[in-house]
From Swiss-Prot:
Pfam families: BRISC_FAM175B_helical, MPN_2A_DUB_like. Its main location: cytoplasm. InterPro entries: BRISC_FAM175B_helical, FAM175, MPN. Belongs to the FAM175 family. Abro1 subfamily. This is BRISC complex subunit FAM175B. It comes from Camponotus floridanus. It is found in: Cytoplasm; Nucleus; Cytoplasm, Cytoskeleton, Spindle pole; Cytoplasm, Cytoskeleton. Residues 359-370 have a biased composition (Low complexity). Keywords: Cell cycle, Cell division, Coiled coil, Cytoplasm, Cytoskeleton, Mitosis, Nucleus, Ubl conjugation pathway. PANTHER family: ABRAXAS FAMILY MEMBER, OS07G0540200 PROTEIN. CDD domains: Abraxas_2_insects. Component of the BRISC complex, at least composed of FAM175B/ABRO1, BRCC3/BRCC36, BABAM2 and BABAM1/NBA1. Within the complex, interacts directly with BRCC3/BRCC36. The heterodimer with BRCC3/BRCC36 assembles into a heterotetramer. The BRISC complex binds polyubiquitin. GO terms for molecular function: microtubule binding; polyubiquitin modification-dependent protein binding. It comes from the Eukaryota.
Amino acid sequence: MADSDLLVTISGAALSLLFFENVRSVGNQMGFLLGEALEFIVKTYTDSDNQVETVKIHINVEAIVTCPLADLLHDSTNHINKEKLKDFVRDKSKQVIGWFCFRRNTTNLTLTLKDKLLHKQFASHFSGVNGCKEDFFLTCLLNASTSETSGTHKFRHVFLRHNKRGMFEPISLKINNLGDDASRHDGSDYKPTPVRKSTRTPDSFTKLIESLNLDVARIDGLDSAMLIQKAAEHHLMSLIPKVCESDLEVAELEKQVHELKIKIATQQLAKRLKINGENCDRISKASKDNCFSEKIDSSKKNEVRIGDDACLQREHIPSCTQSVGPNNRTVCRNTAACIAKSAEKSRRAGRSNLQESGNQQQETQNFFTNSRRSIPEIATESICQEGSEISMGRGRGSGRGSHEFTPGMKKIRRTPGTSHMHSSRERSTTPPEQDFSDAECPISSPVLRSYSQVTKKTNLDKCNSMAPLDI
């Protein structure tokens, strides 16, 4: 009596590597699972001394190979390219026991029609290479999610196989601890020997034991253990240079990848700057056009306002107003005509201002010329009013004793400051001093002669006193 049991085993390091490679990818990703399928026959005895044989198959996943470009292995119709698949897997085709598919932004771990087609093609291709049955070829679906604070990462996974009934059924997974082995599924110390392996190639430990040719019957167990330890240390020391070379190759590749990333980043930055520069030029050009259009609009508005003001002025002036009926209104104005009218108006205003200023200058000149009188007229002018008692004498000195004032005049207290102020005001407002040296005086009356001489003398003294002040 025999029944079958299928189990998938994987180490913690291999499972962590699988999750890490999927999370660090940008989008969806696929790849292959490397390992071997082990078949065990476990014999048990019942209470009635019946022997029961149980066949257990353990599919041990040891490593993974990721494929960044899924379209590299198959075309748009989901048919795989066997030549490209061989070039991608190379010498690891005998270790392929399944494939995986990682999807982002989804919580559904079910196979699509595309996944089913790819699974059948991969199983038929690799089962003929490594001797593994198509029923034991695995499919692993994975997804990942993070919490709101990005502090917790959640991973979901399921292993499936295609059974004989044509359906995909899930397979239980067991994660091996450091002290466990893939063959000891129950955690016991008893290590069964596999009856059949999917891979015929021996591992490193088997090669090491075979190279020693130990005779267990003749050599003590302690001595054989010491020989195995020394051989293992020698093998590890021989692997150090190979590991160093591989690490150097990896470092060189990482350096090249970093340089390519920097180059791509600089190209993208230059492209962005170029686009931004073009956008800035477009924006500046658009702003200039907008400013120009705004200036044109404002000038048009000003022209319309000038035209409206001119119309209002024409309406207010009776001589220029004309009766305009509702049917005679102008529908639109000519901008050029408005500009010409405003320019002509400004020119006329400037000419009128010039004429007014010229008239004012002419009036001031006439005023000064009219105000210039001869000395006899000044001397014969009466200071007091005619008919008054004090108007007997002629001259400026007579009648000083009178304190009568004409109506409208005010009494001002004379101070040195005010006299100085009046003198400065006289200098600034009065016309230039006249030279009375050549003035003709009539000799008819002695009073007039004496007054003219006094006036002439005082005027000369005044001119002499003002001469040093004019700098």
